[in-house]
């Protein structure tokens, strides 16, 4: 058993440090947080609770191309529950090495958010391509002012 552990541990850790060419998040899910409790991810606070009916995101690290689709991004609770409320635009944010001293973020341009909570983007990140090595990448849907509303889930590397 000890031999298996000695052989497998380096393999497991190496798998997370390889530079992937593409990362896909198969779902976009809303932030689950209590009112007035900042659910902080990579130093970025969340807003009030949101939900989605679907979505996905893809980042090609080699080409610096990002695409995302979010569907049904709406508030959960409050007077605007079930709608995007006053939010009319969102952006995608890639976070590389979250929480580490060498954390890097890359943002997309703002895109319109429909009254049904739908938005889509395809293009390049503002400020250049993401770093070649991006450990534990996170994908967030954010307000222009900075708070995150949703995150990529069910991540897969290619």
Q: PLM features: residue spans?
A:
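N-terminal segment immediately downstream of the Sec signal-peptide cleavage site
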Residues: 20-63, 155-158
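Helix-rich interaction surfaces within compact, conserved domain-sized segments
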Residues: 100-158
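Short amphipathic, basic-aromatic surface patches that mediate peripheral association
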Residues: 72-83
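Sec/Tat signal peptide C-region and signal peptidase I cleavage site
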Residues: 13-20
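Structural beta-strand segments of beta-rich domains
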Residues: 64-68
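Sec-dependent signal peptide recognition
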Residues: 2-10
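Extended low-complexity, serine/threonine- and proline-enriched intrinsically disordered segments
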Residues: 81-100
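A mature extracytoplasmic/lumenal domain signature
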Residues: 72-74, 96-98, 125
């Amino acid at each position: 058993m000890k031999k298996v552990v000695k052989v497998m541990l380096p393999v497991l850790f190496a798998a997370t440090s390889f530079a992937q060419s593409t990362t896909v998040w198969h779902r976009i899910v809303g932030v689950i947080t209590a009112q007035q409790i900042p659910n902080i991810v990579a130093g970025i606070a969340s807003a009030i609770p949101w939900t989605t009916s679907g979505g996905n995101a893809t980042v090609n690290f080699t080409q610096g191309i990002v695409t995302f689709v979010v569907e049904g991004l709406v508030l959960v609770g409050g007077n605007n529950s079930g709608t995007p409320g006053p939010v009319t635009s969102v952006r995608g944010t890639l976070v590389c090495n979250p929480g580490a001293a060498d954390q890097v973020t890359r943002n997309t341009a703002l895109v319109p958010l429909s009254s049904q909570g739908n938005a889509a983007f395809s293009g390049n990140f503002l400020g250049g391509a993401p770093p070649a090595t991006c450990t534990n990448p996170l994908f967030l849907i954010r307000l222009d002012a900075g708070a995150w509303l949703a995150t990529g889930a069910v991540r897969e590397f290619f």
